[in-house]
Regions:
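Short beta-strand edge/turn micro-motifs at domain boundaries
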Residues: 1-2, 105-134
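Surface-exposed, charged secondary-structure patches
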Residues: 54-102
Length: 134
């Protein structure tokens, strides 16, 4: 049986996106496992992952919990630039209820997670996600 590298990369991207989204819904510290050491923002601005981690902690600290998290992945795409490098994305829609004491707020919308293939592993290099802002 012949191995299909396209399927493996697509599956890796989807699985990484799912781990990120599920960690988001749980407000889990394991979310950092999916992040690259650097992020590429519009205008070719590059920032370190520690800035993103601090931002995530600040966002998670605004709510006691997230409940009812749901998502649908609509598209996955990637381009390899040699065997060890590539760029890709996973996009879809996500929603959840942010609860703080007796108040709750529904947060939903489209998401797009941008990935770079680094040392054989897909890592997130940019985040567009409901409730997240740089």
């Amino acid at each position: 049986m012949q191995e299909n590298p396209t399927f493996n990369h697509q599956a890796d991207l989807v699985n990484s996106a799912i781990r990120f989204i599920n960690s988001w819904f749980r407000q889990s510290k394991t979310i950092t496992a999916e992040l690259s050491n650097f992020f590429i923002l519009p205008g070719n601005k590059v920032i370190g992952a520690e800035v993103i981690v601090a931002r995530l902690k600040g966002i998670f600290g605004q709510s006691d919990e997230y409940v009812g998290g749901r998502y649908d992945i609509i598209d996955v795409n990637f381009e390899l630039m040699g065997e060890e490098k590539g760029m890709g994305f996973v996009e879809g829609v996500a929603g959840f209820r942010a609860v703080l004491k007796d108040q709750s707020k529904i947060i939903s919308g489209p998401f797009k997670l941008y990935f770079a293939l680094q040392n054989g592993s897909w890592k997130i290099v940019n985040i567009e996600f409901p409730g997240f802002a740089y």
